[in-house]
From Swiss-Prot:
It is found in: Mitochondrion inner membrane. One of its GO terms (biological process) is mitochondrial electron transport, NADH to ubiquinone. Signal peptide: none annotated. It catalyses: a ubiquinone + NADH + 5 H(+)(in) = a ubiquinol + NAD(+) + 4 H(+)(out). Core subunit of respiratory chain NADH dehydrogenase (Complex I) which is composed of 45 different subunits. Interacts with TMEM242. Keywords: Electron transport, Membrane, Mitochondrion, Mitochondrion inner membrane, NAD, Respiratory chain, Translocase, Transmembrane, Transmembrane helix, Transport, Ubiquinone. Its EC number is 7.1.1.2. It is an enzyme of class 7 (translocase). It comes from Paranyctimene raptor. This is NADH-ubiquinone oxidoreductase chain 2. Core subunit of the mitochondrial membrane respiratory chain NADH dehydrogenase (Complex I) which catalyzes electron transfer from NADH through the respiratory chain, using ubiquinone as an electron acceptor. Essential for the catalytic activity and assembly of complex I. The gene is MT-ND2.
Length: 347
């Protein structure tokens, strides 16, 4: 893709998200979402082939439906209140429709079907944008309307997302699908706490973006798209192998790594609000995610698949890909947990 065109597209994606996050007018929120959706289609189709074409079409149809629902909610809100302001409280009907629209944009269950299919059909760099940056705008609106969200609807979708995100990734060997199911599960954790403590949901989103970015950068650096190709990382980049081990375990939420921090705080917050069954189910289901990440870590770092002698000398050749940005990202994705006591300042 032409660098000038790519720069313009990326700037449009950023501008659309910034408009959604900063405006207080519902029509501008919708326009920001539309800019964001239309600008990312060329990014998804960067490597033109039938799979990326299919993925882009699925993404467009899903997001267009979500935008239609969002506009319906905005119009109903305008009829009831006579105002375009996002600070105005929503009535129950508008809140439910808007929550469903945002759930579709985020990939929450039962609107999660597009996430693994779209992520699998695109490049790793496009998948990184799809699973990180594209979550910012819907989460910011969910944050704004959190006081008026229907509690039971959101908790039902959140718990279903955590369950599906854990079960769906168990039988996968494609790394992009594993990351997609992990994203569904993480979105479930974030939206669970959104009503009780919206600030904690944003903190969870930040840690999720750090962990996912680090993982995708590792995949891109090693050109790995399957479990088998990742298992050959030891002879391409021996230094990166141990980093992959720690990042995978952190993404699975194993203490004392960074990924455990949001789970710990969310379970603590839910318990404070006299919710016992919900965090218990969530904690048990988190073991499913941890299992498939431990399986990835084991196949990458702790075992050696049968290979030819020629493969064992790959590490001697120079690698042109730079690791400058990856080092601080790996540190952030593994060592944030000791800072958790300082987060009491947010309350």
């Amino acid at each position: 893709m032409n660098p000038v065109v790519l720069t313009m597209i990326l700037l449009t994606i950023m501008l659309g998200t910034v408009i959604v996050m900063t405006t207080s007018h519902w029509l501008l929120v919708w326009i920001g979402f539309e800019m964001n959706m239309l600008a990312i289609i060329p990014i998804l189709m960067k490597k033109y082939n039938p799979r990326s074409m299919e993925a882009s079409t699925k993404y467009f149809l899903t997001q267009a439906t979500a935008s239609m629902l969002l506009m319906l909610a905005i119009v109903i809100n305008l009829i009831h209140s006579g105002q375009w302001s996002t600070t105005n409280p929503l009535d129950p009907t508008t809140s439910i429709i808007m929550t469903l629209a945002l759930a579709m944009k985020l990939g929450l269950a039962p609107f999660h079907f597009w996430v693994p299919e779209v992520t699998q059909g695109i490049q790793l760099s496009s998948g990184l944008i799809l699973l990180t940056w594209q979550k910012l705008a819907p989460m910011s609106i969910l944050y704004q309307i959190s006081p008026t969200i229907n509690l039971h609807l959101l908790l039902l979708m959140s718990l279903t997302s955590i369950l599906i995100g854990g079960w769906g990734g168990l039988n996968q060997t494609q790394l992009r699908k594993i990351m997609a199911y992990s994203s569904i599960a993480h979105m479930g954790w974030m939206t669970t706490i959104m009503i009780y403590n919206p600030t904690m949901a944003l903190l969870n989103l930040t840690i999720y973006i750090i962990l996912t970015t680090t993982t995708f950068m590792t995949f891109m650096m090693s050109s790995s798209t399957t479990t088998l190709s990742l298992s050959h990382l030891w002879n391409k980049m021996p230094l990166l192998t141990s980093a992959v081990l720690m990042t995978m375990l952190s993404l699975g939420g194993l203490p004392p790594l960074s990924g455990f921090s949001p789970k710990w705080m969310i379970i603590q917050e839910l318990t404070k609000n006299n919710s016992i069954i919900m965090p218990t189910i969530m904690a048990i289901t988190a073991l499913l995610n941890l299992f498939f990440y431990m399986r990835l870590a084991y196949s990458t770092s702790l075992t050696m698949f049968p290979s030819t002698n020629n493969m064992k000398i790959k590490w001697q050749f120079n690698n042109s890909k730079s690791m400058n940005l990856l080092s601080p990202m790996i540190i952030l994705s593994t060592l944030i947990l000791p800072l958790s006591p300082m987060l009491a300042l947010l309350e």
